[in-house]
Regions:
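Transmembrane helix-loop-helix
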Residues: 85-95
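Functional transmembrane core segments of multi-pass inner-membrane proteins
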Residues: 2, 98-228, 278-284
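Transmembrane alpha-helical segments of multi-pass membrane transport proteins and ion-pumping complexes
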Residues: 7, 11, 15, 81, ...
Length: 284
């Protein structure tokens, strides 16, 4: 049942991915073929099944429909089922499903358009903080900070979890602000978009301090590896531009960093605990 619900949400996410970056309504008009713009009948809009029955083509113009549509539906469904398997029945699973929905959407919109819409990130920040109170998570990061500062611990797990979420959102946004400022001072150009600030704040609100630190660590590593592999495997003229400097030409590649924030946050959501335990094992 949860898999089917995930397919439906994945289908809706496809609408968001296609329309929000173009500033179009996600309610009207009804779904249309991206090529001939013919309205898609309900029988041709069943997640995955319709795409398979039509062999990935529009019923009207017979042009190919992107494989992205069934893949997004399947991916969201898999994340929903994985969330239930990992967290069990409860608010935490609902929180994880919502987080996966938002993050998958942001990853694909950033990859396709370089746009991280406020329609996803701003409500995501508020929802992350709300769920922190409804489904208190592991606030060990905040407890460590409070102990180091010799400050009292807030009464009750809900308050502790909420403050942990707010602190993580502020930490995520602050990290990118200082990274943006440092890059601008050195290079005199913007290296991080403001959408990344909001996305990182949203991730912090959902994951809390401990896992947000893991995302801050993982995302630059993944981004750097991607940039290096792209430069090594592709024609430099297609992925970079030369910029003069004191040492000669510097090769700069455009990297959609929201993609790596999203991937890192999903890794942290499902594998963050064993990764932290592995890391802390070196100090025992």
């Amino acid at each position: 049942m949860l898999f089917v619900i995930g397919l439906v949400f994945g289908s809706f996410l496809n609408v968001c991915i296609s329309r929000i970056p173009r500033d179009l309504s996600i309610v009207t008009p009804r779904s249309r073929c991206p090529h001939c713009h013919a309205p898609i009948a309900w029988r041709d809009n069943i997640p995955i099944l319709s795409w398979l029955l039509l062999q990935g083509k529009c019923r009207h113009c017979q042009r190919t429909i992107s494989l992205r549509y069934p893949w997004v539906e399947l991916l969201v469904a898999v994340f929903f089922v994985t969330s239930y398997a990992y967290f069990g029945l409860g608010w935490t699973t609902l929180k994880a499903c919502l987080f996966c929905f938002l993050v998958v959407g942001l990853i694909l919109m950033d990859a396709e358009t370089g746009y991280l819409p406020a329609e996803f990130t701003y409500p995501g920040i508020l929802l992350g903080m709300l769920f922190a109170a409804l489904a208190p998570g592991n606030a060990s990061g905040l407890l460590f900070v409070l102990a180091a500062l010799e400050r009292p611990v807030p009464a009750g797990p809900r308050w502790l979890s909420f403050i942990d979420a707010v602190s993580a959102a502020l930490l995520g946004a602050a990290f990118f602000y200082f990274a943006w400022a440092a890059y601008y001072l050195i290079r005199k150009r913007h290296g991080v978009g403001f959408g990344d600030f909001a996305m990182m704040a949203m991730i912090g609100a959902f994951l809390g301090l401990r896992l947000t630190l893991l995302v801050i660590f993982l995302a630059p590593i993944l981004g750097t590896l991607y940039a290096l592999l792209t430069l090594l495997r592709s024609d430099r003229r297609q992925v970079a531009q030369a910029q003069p400097s004191g040492d000669g030409a510097v090769l700069l590649a455009e990297v959609p960093f929201g993609v790596f924030l999203g991937v890192s946050s999903l890794i942290a959501l499902f594998l963050g605990r064993p990764i932290w335990n592995w890391y802390l094992g070196f100090f025992r």
